[in-house]
């Protein structure tokens, strides 16, 4: 009986710890700024209609601003490891904002954390510091562009979400990867459409020192059973999707 009591006490401690780590965001507010918790800052505010009511909604990217999450390297470079979150706010005809989606699961991390750990981070298609370009609202869809840098390569992924079934569901994924070794240069591109349940891809392998080139193409139907939601996307979700359907 005592062991059972200790177990439930430990479980309660874990639950409380997670609640302390999570931020409390309001469900409704009259200003976008009201959704930014104390100790956090705005990184991107992107406006556009996401629910076909002809009223501009808001995609808000925020980042914690805690000195404890800054680290100095041996060459005195300062790295910012502060966590980031994505919020989607629907604006109604009364100019009130409603929180309809949020992700604070590490789906998007800071540029410095991504650089050090080879993770995905929001990226401008022009490779500049304007992160507002990494978010695009087009044809009632929300598109997030991310990039991962490697020693001799990179990975670029565009996630396409649509608001349906009262949530932002992933309806498409565009993936590009390139890598160069001492012998080969590899270019891979995949396009997955979860609405039509199709995958189209190409893999181009070229010799660095030779004229040897090998191109593989794939186009197939996929059995889509899982739904991927913006709120529950994680850092490795994109890779897991590719591993699941590219087989």
Sequence positions of predicted segments:
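N-terminal targeting signals for Sec/Tat export/insertion, comprising classic cleavable signal peptides
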Residues: 30-57
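Beta-propeller blade repeat segments, especially FG-GAP/WD-type strand-to-loop junctions
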Residues: 25-27, 67-104, 160-163
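Acidic/hydrophobic-patterned starts of short beta strands in beta-sheet-rich repeat architectures
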Residues: 50-62, 136-146
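Blade-edge motifs of beta-propeller repeat domains
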Residues: 22-38, 94-124
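Acidic, small-residue rich beta-repeat scaffolds with periodic aromatic anchors
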Residues: 120-247
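Bacterial N-terminal signal peptides
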Residues: 9-19
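Short glycine/acidic-enriched loop and turn motifs that connect beta-strands
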Residues: 65-67, 150-151
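Bacterial N-terminal signal peptides that target proteins for export
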Residues: 1-10
């Amino acid at each position: 009986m005592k062991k059972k009591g200790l177990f439930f006490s430990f479980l309660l401690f874990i639950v409380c710890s997670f609640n302390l780590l999570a931020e409390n965001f309001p469900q409704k507010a009259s200003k976008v700024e009201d959704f930014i918790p104390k100790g956090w800052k705005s990184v991107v505010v992107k406006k556009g209609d996401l629910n076909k009511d002809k009223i501009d909604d808001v995609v808000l990217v925020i980042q914690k601003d805690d000195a404890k999450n800054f680290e100095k390297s041996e060459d005195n470079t300062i790295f910012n490891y502060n966590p980031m979150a994505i919020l989607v706010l629907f604006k109604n005809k009364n100019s009130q904002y409603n929180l309809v989606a949020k992700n604070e699961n590490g789906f998007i991390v800071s540029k410095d954390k991504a650089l050090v750990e080879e993770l995905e981070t929001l990226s401008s298609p022009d490779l500049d510091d304007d992160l507002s370009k990494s978010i695009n609202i087009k044809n009632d869809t929300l598109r997030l562009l991310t990039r991962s840098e490697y020693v001799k390569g990179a990975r670029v992924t565009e996630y396409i979400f649509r608001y349906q079934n009262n949530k932002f569901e992933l309806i498409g994924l565009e993936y590009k990867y390139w890598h160069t070794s001492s012998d080969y240069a590899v270019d891979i591109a995949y396009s997955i459409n979860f609405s039509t349940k199709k995958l189209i891809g190409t893999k181009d392998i070229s010799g660095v020192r030779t004229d040897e080139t090998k191109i593989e193409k794939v186009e197939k139907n996929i059995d889509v059973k899982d739904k991927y939601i913006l709120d529950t996307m994680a850092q490795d979700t994109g890779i897991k999707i590719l591993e699941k359907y590219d087989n």
